[in-house]
Amino acid sequence: MKKLAEFYRGKAKTVYHTSHPSFLILEFRNDISILDGQCIKQFDRKGMINNKFNFFIMNKLAELGIPTQIEQLLSDNETLVKKLDMIPVECVIRNRAAGSLVRRLGIEEGQILNPPLLELFFKNDSMHDPIINASYCTTFNLVSDTNLVRMQQLTKHANNILTKIFDKKGIILVDFKLEFGLFNNQIILGDEFSPDVSRLWDKKTLKKMDKDRLRQNLGGVIEAYEEVAIRIGVSLT
């Protein structure tokens, strides 16, 4: 399948058309952004790590009943995917308090959330992805009620799968974001799962092993990404 012109350039990935109208190529760049793209830095190997990390996780989810857009790993930093009609609603699930939740509610970072908290955000960088609820989705026709329920079900299912995968390797899955789209009128998991869109802490030390290392000037960003990948079994060779 031939790679064609650029379709979309995001903060850390570039999407390309292909010679088949139903498929795209995701290119994972070495860019890493914070503050809704206002600050972008580059780290060697980052695109490769996230591409292979994402491919590994998406396949694990697909094996356990979650439909994903993943088709084929093409190279160190490229993956062939289904072309989805993306839904502008992000599903965030939180197993522990961190990030914006701590700031909004004034609760202690690391507080265990039982049951896990599922939040919805309107995907819009210029408005800093405001938090919304199901009523917003209906009123503004962001996603149908049926599809929203399906997205929430799949997010909870993914959380059940992923918390076990990471826990077995000594990692706490603190929270993560998922994005969905439509393919042949079916809800499909799209975008990516990587340390860019999740929070991951070491179980023993609570060391942060995700993009918070950049947000909080902790250093060792790529080293942390690589350690998580290797622990859970991602082949980086």
UniProtKB/Swiss-Prot annotation:
Alphabetized CDD domains for the sequence: SAICAR_synt_PurC (cd01415)
Any one of the GO CC terms: cytosol
Enzyme class: ligase
Catalysed reaction, written as an equation: 5-amino-1-(5-phospho-D-ribosyl)imidazole-4-carboxylate + L-aspartate + ATP = (2S)-2-[5-amino-1-(5-phospho-beta-D-ribosyl)imidazole-4-carboxamido]succinate + ADP + phosphate + 2 H(+)
Enzyme Commission number(s): 6.3.2.6
UniProt key word Cell membrane: no
Pfam families: SAICAR_synt (PF01259)
Pathway: Purine metabolism; IMP biosynthesis via de novo pathway; 5-amino-1-(5-phospho-D-ribosyl)imidazole-4-carboxamide from 5-amino-1-(5-phospho-D-ribosyl)imidazole-4-carboxylate: step 1/2
GO annotation, biological process: 'de novo' IMP biosynthetic process; cobalamin biosynthetic process
Gene Ontology molecular-function annotations: ATP binding; phosphoribosylaminoimidazolesuccinocarboxamide synthase activity
PANTHER family per record: MULTIFUNCTIONAL PROTEIN ADE2 (PTHR43599), SI:DKEY-6E2.2 (PTHR43599:SF3)
NCBIfam families: purC
Protein name: Phosphoribosylaminoimidazole-succinocarboxamide synthase
Source species of the chain: Baumannia cicadellinicola subsp. Homalodisca coagulata
